[in-house]
Amino acid sequence: MKNILVTGSVGQIGSELTLELRKRYGSSNVVAGINRTLPTGDLADTGPYLKVDTTNIEELAFAVRKYRIDTIYHLAAVLSAIGEKNPGLAWNIGVNGLYNVLEVARENNCAVFFPSSIGAFGPTTPLDDTPQDTIQRPTSMYGVTKVTGEMLCDYYYMRFGVDTRGVRYPGIISNVTLPGGGTTDYAVEIYYEAVKNGKFTCPLAKGTFLDMMYMPDAIDAAINLMEADPSDLKHRNAFNISAMSFDPEIIAAEIRKHIPGFVMDYDVDPVKQKIADTWPNRMDDTAAREEWGWDPKYNLESMTADMLKVISEKHNKGLI
């Protein structure tokens, strides 16, 4: 049985990934690594947790040794828009934190999952059907940390044999955890505002197409990649994965199929728009499909129906 540590376990992806890992591998075998925010609810009640500041290598090594960790899902990160406001913090957590994770993994024979992002691409990257292997050169600090992370993971595999694996996530949409400063967060906020107020002001411009994915598929991607036969993996790290691509008008139109009176206007955030304009419209995820069987379950229609159902239930119960 695996012994797993999840860093960034109270974040958008980490909180749901930790619970799913506990279901699959046993609650006591999955440790939630926390830093400034204490876990609540099921995350706190279903398994162990302890403070793990990934920028503190001694603290990280202690957690790995204490729980005899053999697999680290490294989710601790600073999101894109926040990273532009505090680039030093983004670098420290995004790069120095990952370096510590890889060093501890090397010393303790751990496998490492590292999530990269569509943010790893830049304005010179082909925006349509973005290839698996292509020029990147991002212009945001978030993107710089992700490209650096991809290269570090490749280096530690080639140089030291550390079993590093990772994906490039698109925007992630969740009905559980509220967003926290990402460029694609509007695609979560729009559902909540549609249910609560019947209207939404979008911070990205009409025609801004971005790759997106529903959280259940994002979680499956991480776990399935880590379970894949290593002999099948030609790339190992930074796999493009995609589930759907849309702009604000398309998602609004889908919501109107369920809430006919929904209205949307625009107040474009220049920081988020500048970042979004450099990201792919849609990535080519052929490598992930061929090498480890990537196959998302949700498209825009099925995701929208599920999002609105769950959020409406929360709203009716007074939870949001």
Residue ranges and their predicted role:
Residues N3-R24:
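N-terminal Rossmann NAD(P)H-binding glycine-rich loop of SDR-like oxidoreductase domains
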Residues V147, F160, I173-V188, M215-P216, ...:
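Glycine/proline-rich active-site loop of Rossmann-fold NAD(P)-dependent oxidoreductases
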Residues S117, M151-V176:
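Conserved beta-loop-beta element that borders a ligand/cofactor-binding pocket
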Residues T54-I93:
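NAD(P)H-binding glycine-rich loop region in Rossmannoid oxidoreductase-like domains
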Residues P203-A205, D211-I320:
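C-terminal substrate-binding subdomain of Rossmann-fold SDR/epimerase-dehydratase oxidoreductases
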